[in-house]
């Protein structure tokens, strides 16, 4: 991050300007586009863009492009996060501009939430309807946390994140994280879910799960939640997940498997031996397995570790 005294002073100088401080406060609460920030602070787009560039050059903000938009958020470096957090904690929240900014941000979030809700209700993919087979959500969340808790989650990747459900469960355990989905509408839904859950250290990107733009050995933990039976090539998916996993990193696969005493034909399902085979062929070693029994479908959770020789 800041490698010298001068870099640190430059960052403080960039922050110490009224409009830029407002922008930092907003970006600390989630990912926002230039046009959204322009509407909130009530200034021209060129002026806001200039402020954002100065903050990014100083290492306080970072940005990423998605389609025609550029999103900004506070840099995820822990030193920057600590500095921004300490500054914001001392900021009186009852100032007129702070109140107005927050009201406009809340209004924007409300509009986002409405769009997300309408999309989920009218165009939701069939696989989201399978959530009814999860039974007790608290039990499922607990099983995921137990599966991941033996060691730090670190930098997290959730593949085909959908509504962002896995990010909301595992995200609080992670230092930072990314959810990816090919659908730009599902990215919108997941991004809204993270904002509502107050998880600003997580982000969502539109990506092809078979050809992710992340470098090799980039993540400490990768999750694949209820995706394999809809994947055209699950073997290739697991190999791509392994590529971006650090040596000794962990992959958590969650999948429906047919219940031992199923009361009716399962709508989907996958044979657990196939999952094990795909994991082993990708250079992973299964270290833990948990099964949550159900009436029609069991939920199987498999944790595997990347072998060092595949680094």
What are these regions (language model features)?
Residues 2, 79-128:
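Amphipathic alpha-helical dimerization/coiled-coil segments
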Residues 135-154:
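Conserved alpha-helix/loop element of class I SAM-dependent methyltransferases that forms part
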Residues 157, 163-211:
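Class I SAM-dependent methyltransferase SAM/SAH-binding core
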Residues 235-250:
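A short glycine-rich, Lys/Arg-flanked "PGG" loop and its adjoining helix->strand segment in the class I
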Residues 252-276:
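Conserved class I S-adenosyl-L-methionine
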Residues 282, 291-311:
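Core SAM-dependent methyltransferase catalytic element
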């Amino acid at each position: 991050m800041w490698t010298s005294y001068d870099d640190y002073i430059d960052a403080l100088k960039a922050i110490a300007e009224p409009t830029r401080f407002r922008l930092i406060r907003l970006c600390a609460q989630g990912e926002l586009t230039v046009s959204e920030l322009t509407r909130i602070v009530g200034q021209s787009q060129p002026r806001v863009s200039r402020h954002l560039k100065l903050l990014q050059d100083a290492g306080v903000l970072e940005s990423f492009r998605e389609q025609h938009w550029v999103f900004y958020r506070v840099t995820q470096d822990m030193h920057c996060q600590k500095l921004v957090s300490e500054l914001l904690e001392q900021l009186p929240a009852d100032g007129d501009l702070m109140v107005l900014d927050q009201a406009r941000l809340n209004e924007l979030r409300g509009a986002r939430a409405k769009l997300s809700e309408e999309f989920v209700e009218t165009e939701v993919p069939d696989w989201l309807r399978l959530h009814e087979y999860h039974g007790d959500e608290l039990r499922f969340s607990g099983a995921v946390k137990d599966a991941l808790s033996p060691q730090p989650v670190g930098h997290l990747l959730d593949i085909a994140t959908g509504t962002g459900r896995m990010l909301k469960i595992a995200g609080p355990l992670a230092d930072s994280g990314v959810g990816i989905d090919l659908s730009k509408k599902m990215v919108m839904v997941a991004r809204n879910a993270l904002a509502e859950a107050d998880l600003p250290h997580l982000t969502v990107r539109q990506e092809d799960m078979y050809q992710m733009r992340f470098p090799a050995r980039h993540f400490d933990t990768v999750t694949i939640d209820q995706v394999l039976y809809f994947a055209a090539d699950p073997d290739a998916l697991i190999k791509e997940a392994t590529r971006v996993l650090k040596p000794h990193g962990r992959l958590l696969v969650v999948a429906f498997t047919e219940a031992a005493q199923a009361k009716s034909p399962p709508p989907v399902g996958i044979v657990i031996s196939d999952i094990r085979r795909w994991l082993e062929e990708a250079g992973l070693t299964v270290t833990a397995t948990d099964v949550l029994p159900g009436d029609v479908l069991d939920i199987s959770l498999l944790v595997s570790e990347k072998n060092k020789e595949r680094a």
